[in-house]
Structure formats: C-alpha cells, structure tokens
C-alpha cells in the first residue's frame, strides 16, 4: 500500500 489513500485512511 502506498499513496494518500493509506495516509488519509490513518487520518
């Protein structure tokens, strides 16, 4: 997994 999708999911 990489990208904003993962980062936004953690938000």
Swiss-Prot record:
It comes from the Eukaryota. It is found in: Secreted, Cell wall. Its main location: secreted. One of its GO terms (cellular component) is extracellular region. Keywords: Cell wall, Secreted. This is Unknown protein 4.
